[in-house]
């Protein structure tokens, strides 16, 4: 603002003037200083661009590009102020010495204009080295800069800045480069003019001149004396449009500062980018008007298209707006082109009155003026026409309305009362226009442009995702998949009860008998040769293993198996427990799934079962196409040759390392005892016994994968500089982690003990002698709040980025741990490969990130400062590090000082590995309990809350109490509801118990404790041992008071339950609520029944129960036990009730929850209230839900009752969701297909298929005769004569069947479900035996709450609730009603679209009650079938598309057998229904349900809106289990009727089926089944065929059917609202995503299948690209309906 008048004022007279002066002073104090000399026009430009910032002009320098440089400096200050220590990309040479806060700079080798900049760079300071390297082509002198570019550099940095240096990189390239640097934030300044969105041309604005040639854009600002900016157009467009990057390197891009078209973009690495639409140019001062005349060109026989040669003219927005307002409001008589030109000439002159600008004016060329007049005149003509038409139509409508009589007005009034919401103007017809029409306008306004596009990164995620899903793919093939298993946690503490009203049973629960296999067994390698071949081991290793024999001593105790393997002169130990981690040679992690009761083990694709037999131990190995049995005899084997054993171990180690270097995902790391052992190939807890233990040597032949170990890793980590100070002290409150039981025997002597002996080495193997030490699986001892961990074990088991070596002064190979590093990484000791030194620490990346650091020698001098520095100097890095205790070996540093030094000088996430001696010291000196820091602000707020409390009667005991800042130590035992937290407290451990309610106080006092409520306890907790029960629910100020006053404090509670509530709403409770970290978690509940545990498993994933009650939730029964309500208002209406909040911590045998209407918001918003209400009872919970609040969240009494009535059980099943991935652009052949014209593509499709525009919209075929059943008709069959559609083209490529009207419904009912059913009475055994080729005997199926949850989830996703599910009463028609609907979609065809004479298609819907009754069973049966399918057989859509495509591609020599079922639903009869019931009986479904299903299917009534049909048998394509039983019947018919040779792939989905084989023939029993059931099979056998919307091409894969997809789009109605157009765009985008990498292959294959030209498919893909871009054109058509129906003949049976 202009402030001179206030600055010169002699005095301040009013408050307004005082405020204005303060505003002016503030604006001037924060003004931008402009130093260059500027012209008057440049000053105006800068003032307009920099608004609302105040500018102060102090000219003192001459700049070549003053406007850009001022903007650049302003944005640079913003970026550098927020980035801190950062990495800079493409820094200007002049800025190097001025910014010491940059840790690294990325440059490119200078070319062209950059050479001049380097010549003028400073010759002193840090810039001198950069200048010398740039101009002489020398390598970088230090790590502060490089000339590899941003994409080629890998220097780690968390934050970066790029000032006008990313114009030649796309957002995807920047995302990958940021990931390579480990960068989380990047501030990028970019120049993004809006003209790059326009066609090529020359654009002149008030600020700059822009020349756009289609590929590059050159921008020159006003007054520039040097060359302008030259950027790539495609990259600029990407930066303008993109707001996020998806893929393996996701980013969100936010525009945080803008000056004109100069933007600062903040790129942030985020795991799940969310939509971030933005308007880039809301303050644009130009509107771009299109000229209908293009620029002059060269003569040509064929004129070029206007779209590529048209030009735009930049017109000031105020000129265009005023011109539009003037022309639109002119009188009809006065409106003419000359008057518009006169007005435009007038407003184009600049007019000033004194210092006031009355008219800004404009200087324009003749071409621009002509374009503006033309565009304005035509646009105003269009608007005036619309105005005239609207008024004319409105007047005619008003005349009709005023002429209406009383009866008509009364009818309209009644109709409006009962009709929809009133929308003004709906009675008028709307004017429809398209984007490319003349009436759509001639101008583009940047102010209204909105962008929110995502750019996929160029990573190879397709291969990575496919490999990562290999384990689950093996499960689909019928193998065991245990990738979801995690190690089981033990229960910590006593298992008591927290309420004396509940007592456990005196009868011990029964346990299943576990067979004991303890003993000694002989394991010859020859017995496992098939397993070695399945593991794909080299022949050398297989031959060596077959020559060896081992003795395995097995000890089985408490679900754990310990094996001692004697192989030659070596002894190995392994420990098999459930959840044990298996070592791998890749990034994949495998956990062992071990069930001692079932005698099974599994991990990855391998599994085994074992059993004791008379001959010994019988083990069955399954996996990777292997099914092998081996029997191991008891006894002791002769000792194998030690030389052979050593050679086998060495060869096996070399194979593991070779596989590690070339593995993307990896497999198991094979140990000797894992291959020559009972339970091959598993070897968890690998121990190689030796006599000289030191940290790490014991794993010389063991390798736990770390991504940075792989030489071929594309993202090898780099070192960086510490961006934050080290962790200050031990006061960083660690969190105590419950230690796992040790997996190794008693520790060996400490590392300082002398070596006893060396194992013998084989002279024949040529392998040097290597000392083998005891290797133990690492054991977690402690976890700190910052994520750091302390382990007992070998640091070589760590997955950290860096490993720290306890080196010597010269960093040469030595003894102890340094020797182990040299054995593993000899190249890491090469001083020439050290990339950085920090003090005495040396950093290397060869062959993996390692830090060599030497501790002080305490044998000579005790030097604590050097010991601190030894750890501190290892923190100049990015990523985590694994440490040993430095100096505690040879240099004799005590364990305590070394541990304290590490604790004070490490980074979050680091790991410390202790040998057994140090581990025992650590356990004896474990860090203290976690601490809570009370800050001054928290203490002040708590004291304010205490003062408010002390003024009340309840809180008067708190008077005078205060909370002071400080640190409080505490112990916090958290657990699931009913886990016995309070029962674990004994009277000897505590002096005072603080509880939140009187009920809990009385319960504690009955147990003999001194219990008090929070306010009263303020008098007695000082200096006492205090236990605080339900600590999270205590008011936080009282909780802090008691924790600070107590001598020791032990907190009990559940963080997931109701916290302290701020009833008075002063805002103090949430402000001081402490963040308490549980020191232990208890997961076993002794209160909650099984069904309650299932409901709350989302909040407590590891919950288990000892309760024997399976079902405790009941609806509609009388109230029993304690009544619970949600709100205080409901208590008076329910005497004796308590609120859910008050009942927290209590236990009742029976409870009744009463949900009132006022609790709706509380139930939907507070998860904690629901958890507390659910977990108060032990036996029974009665729900009284009159308002239906629980039904609103998807659960009702009918659903639960019917589920248990149908035989459902509490339990777990695998989910039915199939993981699917979106293909990323690894080849991206789709990018070669530009968008094409929609009209030409559909016309070419019509020419190729021979289709022509149809004169009718639909055909009502003649209604066939009703052959069976009874049809109910309405008195009138109303029809419509015409249909209005919004279509993509007037040529339809689908069968034009009947629309949804009465005659069409009748024709469909009669034609599809009124045909006579041919019954076939025969045994199902033959067909079931044939079906066993694909679906073996299923066995009993368990229906669990998992299927019930999936059913409810599907209902909620469809917008349904539980109100439609009724109690199972067959007398109620609503329970058994089957509703019929007419389908609108028609089938794509290459033949005749009209003269087919086929009736329409219908879909039925069973009642929600039957769906809820049978749905869980059908889901469970479907899961059982999927688990039994052989390899190569695909069911429905329960597979990933890439897996199916890979299977088809692998069957290169096969032909495609295709069967087309005609009238598939209509031909199903009593035989197909009997087969379904037989399979249900085979699965263990209750007989009552089977008979009910048979009854519903054998005789039914289809209820249409006005018609109904009583019929028999058939199949309805909408009932529960439609896909399941249709697919099973399809499988049964195909397997029984045809025999296939060399079957490779078979796929079945409903009535569609294909089989890839070399030859087929009809089986002998086929004719009987076909004739008996009246089947209509049409078989085809060709090289390529169609299946379920894809083209099946053996050897190539399953490719999307472009022709069929495009043809089906022509039949649908895409209007009248914009929602349908959005659905079209989304559907087409999803389809194009499947074409990303196979577009060119689709062109060749699809054209061959349909016999069309490849150019058609190419054109169709381009058309789909245009539709996905939102450029679809719709045509409104009104076509008649051809009615060919005749009289319906009914025959009553």
UniProtKB/Swiss-Prot annotation:
Keywords: ATP-binding, Disulfide bond, Helicase, Host cytoplasm, Hydrolase, Magnesium, Metal-binding, Methyltransferase, Nucleotide-binding, Nucleotidyltransferase, Protease, RNA-binding, RNA-directed RNA polymerase, Thiol protease, Transferase, Viral RNA replication, Zinc. Residues 739-752 have a biased composition (Pro residues). Residues 753-763 have a biased composition (Low complexity). Residues 934-1082 form the (+)RNA virus helicase ATP-binding domain. Residues 1454-1565 form the RdRp catalytic domain. Contains a methyltransferase domain, a Y-domain, a putative protease region, a zinc-binding region with similarity to calycins, a proline-rich disordered hypervariable region (HVR), a macro domain (also called X-domain), a helicase domain and an RNA-dependent RNA polymerase domain. Since the boundaries and the activity of the putative protease are not clearly defined, the zinc-binding region might be part of the putative protease. This is Non-structural polyprotein pORF1. It comes from Hepatitis E virus genotype 1 (isolate Human/India/Hyderabad).
């Amino acid at each position: 603002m202009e402030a001179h008048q206030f600055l010169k004022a002699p005095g301040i007279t009013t408050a307004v003037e005082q405020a204005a002066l303060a505003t002016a002073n503030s604006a001037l104090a924060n003004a931008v200083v402009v130093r260059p000399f500027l012209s008057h026009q440049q000053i105006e430009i800068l003032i307009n661009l920099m608004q609302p910032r105040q500018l102060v002009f102090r000219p003192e320098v001459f700049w070549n590009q003053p406007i850009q440089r001022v903007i650049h400096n302003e944005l640079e200050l913003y970026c550098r102020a927020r980035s801190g220590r950062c990495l800079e990309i493409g820094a200007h040479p002049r800025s190097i010495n001025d910014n010491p806060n940059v840790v690294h700079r990325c440059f490119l080798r200078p070319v062209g204009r950059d050479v001049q900049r380097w010549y003028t760079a400073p010759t002193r300071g840090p810039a001198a080295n950069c200048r010398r390297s740039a101009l002489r082509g020398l390598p970088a002198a230090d790590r502060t800069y490089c000339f590899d570019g941003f994409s080629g550099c890998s220097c780690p940095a968390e934050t970066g800045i790029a000032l006008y240096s990313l114009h030649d990189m796309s957002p995807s390239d920047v995302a990958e480069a940021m990931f390579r640097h480990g960068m989380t934030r990047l501030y990028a300044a970019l120049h993004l003019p809006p003209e790059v969105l326009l066609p090529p041309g020359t654009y002149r604005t008030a600020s700059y001149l822009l020349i756009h040639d289609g590929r590059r854009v050159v921008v020159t600002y006003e007054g520039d004396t040097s060359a302008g900016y030259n950027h790539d157009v495609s990259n600029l467009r990407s930066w303008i449009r993109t707001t996020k990057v998806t893929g393996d390197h996701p980013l969100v891009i936010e525009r945080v500062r803008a000056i004109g078209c100069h933007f600062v973009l903040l790129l942030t690495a985020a795991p799940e980018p969310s939509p971030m639409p933005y308007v880039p140019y809301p303050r644009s001062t130009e509107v771009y008007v299109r000229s209908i005349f293009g620029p002059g060109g060269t003569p040509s026989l064929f004129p070029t298209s206007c779209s590529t040669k048209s030009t735009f003219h930049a017109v000031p927005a105020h000129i265009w707006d005023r011109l539009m307002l003037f022309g639109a409001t002119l009188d009809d008589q006065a409106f003419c082109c000359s008057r518009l030109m006169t007005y435009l000439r007038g407003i184009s002159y600049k007019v000033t009155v004194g210092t006031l600008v009355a008219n800004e004016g404009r200087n324009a060329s003749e071409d621009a003026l002509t374009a503006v007049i033309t565009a304005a005149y035509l646009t105003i003509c269009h608007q005036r026409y619309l105005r005239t038409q609207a008024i004319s139509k409105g007047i005619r409508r008003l005349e009709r309305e005023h002429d209406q009589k009383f009866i008509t007005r009364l009818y309209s009034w009644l109709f409006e009362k009962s009709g929809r919401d009133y929308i003004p103007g709906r009675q008028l017809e709307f004017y429809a226009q398209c984007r490319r029409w003349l009436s759509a306008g001639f101008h583009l306004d940047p102010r209204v442009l909105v962008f929110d596009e995502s750019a996929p990164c160029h990573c190879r995620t397709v291969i990575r995702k496919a490999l990562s899903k290999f384990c689950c793919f093996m499960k689909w093939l019928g193998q065991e998949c245990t990738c979801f298993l995690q190690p089981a946690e033990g229960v910590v503490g006593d298992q008591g009860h927290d309420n004396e009203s509940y007592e456990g049973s005196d009868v011990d629960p029964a346990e299943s008998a576990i067979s004991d296999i303890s003993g000694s067994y002989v394991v010859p390698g020859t017995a496992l040769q098939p397993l070695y071949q399945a593991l794909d081991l080299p022949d050398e290793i297989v031959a060596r293993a077959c020559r060896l024999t081992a003795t395995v001593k097995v000890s089985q105790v408490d679900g754990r198996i310990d094996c001692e393997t004697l192989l030659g002169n070596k002894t190995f130990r392994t420990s098999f427990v459930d959840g044990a981690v298996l070592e791998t040679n890749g990034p994949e992690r495998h956990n062992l799934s071990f069930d001692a009761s079932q005698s099974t083990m599994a991990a990855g694709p391998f599994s085994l079962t074992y059993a004791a037999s008379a001959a010994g131990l019988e083990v069955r190995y399954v996996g990777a196409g292997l099914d092998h049995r081996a029997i191991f005899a008891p006894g002791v084997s002769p000792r194998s040759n030690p030389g052979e054993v050593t050679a086998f171990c060495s060869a096996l180690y070399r194979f593991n390392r070779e596989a590690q270097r070339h593995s993307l995902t990896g497999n198991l790391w094979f140990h000797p005892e894992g291959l020559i052992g009972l339970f091959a190939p598993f070897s968890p807890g690998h121990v190689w016994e030796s006599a000289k233990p030191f940290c790490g040597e014991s794993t010389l032949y063991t390798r736990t994968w770390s991504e940075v170990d792989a030489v071929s890793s594309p993202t090898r980590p780099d070192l960086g500089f510490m961006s934050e100070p080290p962790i200050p002290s031990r006061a960083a409150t660690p969190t105590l982690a419950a230690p796992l039981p040790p997996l190794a025997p008693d520790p060996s002597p400490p590392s300082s003990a002398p070596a006893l002996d060396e194992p013998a080495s084989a002279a024949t193997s040529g392998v040097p002698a290597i000392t083998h030490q005891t290797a133990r699986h690492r054991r977690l001892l402690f976890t700190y709040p910052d994520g750091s961990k302390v382990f007992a074990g070998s640091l070589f088991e760590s997955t950290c980025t860096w490993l720290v070596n306890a080196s010597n002064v010269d960093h040469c190979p030595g003894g102890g741990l340094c020797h182990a590093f040299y054995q593993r990484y000899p190249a890491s000791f090469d001083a020439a490969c050290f990339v950085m030194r920090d003090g005495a620490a040396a950093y290397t990346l060869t062959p993996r990130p390692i830090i060599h650091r030497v501790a002080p020698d305490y044998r000579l001098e005790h030097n604590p400062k050097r010991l601190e520095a030894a750890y501190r100097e290892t923190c100049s890095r990015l990523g985590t590090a694994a440490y040993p205790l430095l100096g505690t070996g040879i240099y004799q540093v005590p364990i305590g000082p070394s541990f304290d030094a590490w604790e004070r000088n490490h980074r979050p996430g680091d790991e410390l590995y202790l040998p057994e001696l140090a581990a025992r010291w650590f356990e004896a000196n474990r860090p203290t309990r976690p601490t809570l820091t009370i800050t001054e602000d928290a203490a002040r707020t708590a004291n304010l809350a205490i003062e408010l409390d002390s003024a009340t009667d309840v809180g008067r005991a708190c008077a005078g109490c205060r909370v002071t800042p400080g640190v409080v130590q505490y112990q916090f035992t958290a657990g699931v509801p009913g886990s016995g937290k309070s029962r674990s407290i004994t009277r000897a451990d505590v002096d005072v118990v603080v509880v939140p309610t009187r009920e809990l106080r009385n319960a504690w006092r009955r147990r003999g404790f001194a219990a008090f409520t929070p306010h009263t306890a303020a008098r007695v907790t000082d200096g006492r041992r205090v236990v605080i029960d339900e600590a999270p629910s205590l008011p936080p100020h009282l909780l802090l008071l008691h924790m600070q006053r107590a001598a020791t404090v032990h907190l009990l509670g559940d963080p997931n339950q109701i916290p302290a509530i701020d009833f008075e709403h002063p805002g103090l409770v949430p402000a001081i609520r402490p963040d308490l970290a549980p020191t232990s978690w208890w997961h076993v509940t002794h209160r909650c029944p099984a069904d309650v545990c299932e409901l709350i498993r989302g909040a407590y994933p590891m919950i288990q129960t000892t309760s024997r009650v399976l079902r405790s939730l009941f609806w509609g029964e009388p109230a029993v036990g304690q009544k619970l309500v949600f709100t205080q208002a409901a208590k008076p209406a329910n005497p004796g009730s308590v609120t859910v909040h008050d009942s927290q911590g209590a236990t009742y045998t029976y409870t009744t929850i009463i949900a009132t209407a006022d609790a709706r918001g509380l139930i939907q918003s507070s998860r904690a209230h629901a958890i507390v209400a659910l977990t108060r009872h032990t036996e029974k919970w009665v729900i009284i839900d009159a308002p239906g609040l629980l039904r609103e969240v998807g659960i009702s009494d009918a659903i639960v009752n019917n589920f248990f009535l149908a035989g459902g059980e509490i339990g777990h099943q695998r989910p039915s969701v199939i993981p699917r991935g979106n293909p990323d652009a690894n080849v991206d052949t789709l990018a070669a297909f530009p968008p094409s014209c929609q009209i030409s593509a559909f016309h070419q499709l019509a020419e190729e298929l021979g289709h022509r525009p149809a004169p009718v919209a639909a055909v009502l075929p003649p209604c066939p005769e009703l052959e069976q059943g009874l049809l109910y008709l309405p008195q009138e069959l109303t029809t419509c004569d015409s249909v209005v559609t919004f279509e993509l083209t007037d040529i339809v490529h689908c069968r034009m069947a009947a629309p949804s009207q009465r005659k069409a419904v009748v024709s469909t009912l009669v034609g599809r479900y009124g045909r006579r059913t041919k019954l076939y009475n025969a045994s199902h055994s033959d067909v079931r035996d044939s079906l066993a080729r694909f679906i073996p005997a299923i066995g009993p199926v368990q229906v669990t709450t998992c299927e019930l949850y999936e059913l409810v989830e599907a209902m909620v996703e469809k917008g349904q609730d539980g109100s439609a599910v009724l109690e199972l009463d067959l007398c109620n028609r609503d329970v058994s009603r089957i509703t019929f609907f007419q389908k609108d979609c028609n089938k794509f065809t290459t033949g005749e679209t009209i003269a087919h004479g086929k009736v329409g298609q219908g879909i039925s819907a069973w009642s929600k009650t039957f769906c809820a009754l049978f749905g869980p069973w059908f889901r469970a049966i479907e899961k059982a079938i999927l688990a039994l399918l052989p390899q190569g057989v695909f069911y429905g859509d329960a597979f990933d598309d890439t897996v199916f495509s890979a299977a088809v591609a692998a069957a290169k020599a096969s032909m495609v057998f295709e069967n087309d079922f005609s009238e598939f639903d209509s031909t199903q009869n009593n035989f197909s229904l009997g087969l379904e019931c037989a399979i249900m009986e085979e699965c263990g479904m209750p007989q009552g349900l089977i008979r009910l299903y048979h009854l519903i299917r054998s005789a039914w009534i289809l209820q249409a809106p006005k018609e109904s049909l009583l019929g028999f048998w058939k199949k309805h394509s909408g009932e529960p289990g439609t896909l399941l039983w249709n697919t099973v019947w399809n499988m049964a018919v195909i397997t029984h009727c045809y025999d296939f040779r060399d079957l490779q792939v078979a796929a079945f989905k409903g009535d569609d089926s294909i089989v890839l084989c070399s030859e087929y023939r009809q089986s002998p029993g086929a004719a009987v089944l076909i004739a008996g059931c009246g089947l209509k099979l049409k078989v085809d056998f060709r090289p390529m065929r169609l299946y379920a919307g894809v083209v099946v091409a053996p050897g190539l894969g399953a490719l999307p059917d472009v022709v069929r997809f495009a043809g089906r789009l022509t039949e649908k109605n895409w209007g009248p609202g914009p929602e349908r157009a959005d659905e079209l765009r989304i559907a087409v985008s999803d389809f194009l995503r499947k074409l990303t990498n196979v577009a060119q292959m689709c062109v060749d294959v699809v054209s061959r299948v349909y016999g069309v030209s490849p150019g058609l498919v190419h054109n169709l893909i381009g058309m789909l690209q245009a539709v996905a871009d939102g450029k679809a054109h719709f045509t409104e058509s009104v076509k008649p309906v051809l009615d060919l129906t005749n009289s319906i003949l009914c025959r009553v049976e």
